């Protein structure tokens, strides 16, 4: 007997044809015009689309429901499409992390995860800040959420040095401690550093930790209106050098809008060679902050 049978369903592959979907042990076992066998539960899709669940590749899960604590001024600064605005926003938002506590963070994580499940989001890459203010409280709270929701959500916890590693004393050691606690991914945000040398050290250090722990990499790169930022290129080269192709993801990359075409083409070639995926965070496109012109196809 099937656990679930969905009737009168449309799928992306069947067009207007209505089909039935059989599910056993949490897996789809049959899709046909008529699936044989009885089911413990029958759901009538009423001609609606049944499709894959959603993936959220970039969610700061330790910060959900904290806007009032961080302040509207921090959000306003981030919306300024320039280097100073983005950096100032992060600095302002950092102050409230001194009150980070796993006990209230897990409550917020639960609320966000319940909404994710409700709206069909079953995979989340969840960033948790690791620095002298946040300490490991965010990581602990998000790891706890990962375990509580593991039957409904696939949550990957990113140990994320939001305030930098060169400019934030002790951050490198805290990242290692976060990985020892059970974080799944090594994060990074090299553009937050003050010099190009420090940016490169940030990229190299986090990538070396990824190799040490055999983990994937997920970094926020060039998230500023500054055409001179090159941390995405740094990551591409490091990934190729260390043989980590296909195991790194780049987030935001807003500066790509401003690159001249010849450099843009070079960067795209490097991305392909490094097999780096890009999460563009389309909410910023929806808000009309920038409109990148892509070259080629």
Please describe what each predicted stretch is.
Residues 9, 26, 47, 58, ...:
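Divalent metal-coordination and catalytic microenvironments
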Residues 88-99, 107-137, 142-143, 150-163, ...:
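Divalent metal-dependent hydrolysis catalytic cores, especially in the metallo-beta-lactamase
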Residues 137-151, 167-278, 292-297:
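Histidine/acidic residue-rich metal-binding segments in metalloenzymes
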Residues 7-12, 116, 272-295:
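C-terminal helical cap
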Residues 1-37:
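N-terminal metal-binding scaffold of metallo-dependent hydrolase/deaminase domains
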Residues 65-105, 231-249, 275-278:
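Active-site gating loops and adjacent loop-to-helix segments of metal-dependent hydrolytic enzymes
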């Amino acid at each position: 007997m099937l656990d679930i049978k969905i009737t009168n369903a449309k799928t992306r592959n069947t067009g207007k044809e209505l089909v039935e979907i059989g599910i056993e042990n949490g897996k789809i076992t049959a899709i046909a015009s008529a699936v044989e066998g009885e089911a413990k539960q029958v759901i009538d899709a009423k001609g609606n689309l049944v499709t894959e669940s959603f993936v959220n590749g970039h969610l700061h899960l330790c910060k959900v429901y904290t806007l009032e604590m961080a302040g509207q001024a921090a959000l306003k600064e981030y919306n300024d499409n320039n280097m100073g605005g983005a950096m100032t926003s992060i600095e302002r938002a950092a102050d409230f992390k001194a009150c980070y506590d796993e006990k209230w963070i897990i409550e917020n994580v639960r609320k966000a995860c319940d909404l994710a499940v409700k709206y069909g989001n079953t995979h989340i890459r969840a960033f948790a800040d690791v620095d002298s203010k946040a300490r490991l409280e965010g990581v602990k709270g998000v790891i706890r959420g990962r375990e509580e929701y593991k039957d409904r959500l696939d949550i990957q916890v990113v140990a994320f040095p939001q305030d930098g590693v060169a400019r934030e004393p002790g951050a490198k050691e805290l990242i290692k401690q976060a990985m020892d606690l059970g974080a799944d991914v090594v994060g990074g945000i090299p553009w937050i550093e003050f010099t190009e040398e420090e940016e490169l050290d940030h990229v190299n250090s986090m990538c070396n930790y990824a190799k040490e722990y055999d983990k994937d990499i997920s970094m926020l790169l060039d998230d500023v209106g500054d055409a001179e930022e090159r941390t995405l290129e740094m990551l591409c080269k490091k990934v190729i050098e260390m043989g980590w192709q296909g195991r790194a993801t780049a987030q935001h990359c807003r500066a790509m809008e401003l690159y001249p075409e010849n450099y843009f083409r070079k960067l795209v070639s490097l991305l392909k060679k490094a097999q780096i995926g890009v999460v563009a965070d389309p909410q910023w496109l929806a808000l009309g902050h920038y409109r990148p012109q892509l070259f080629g196809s």
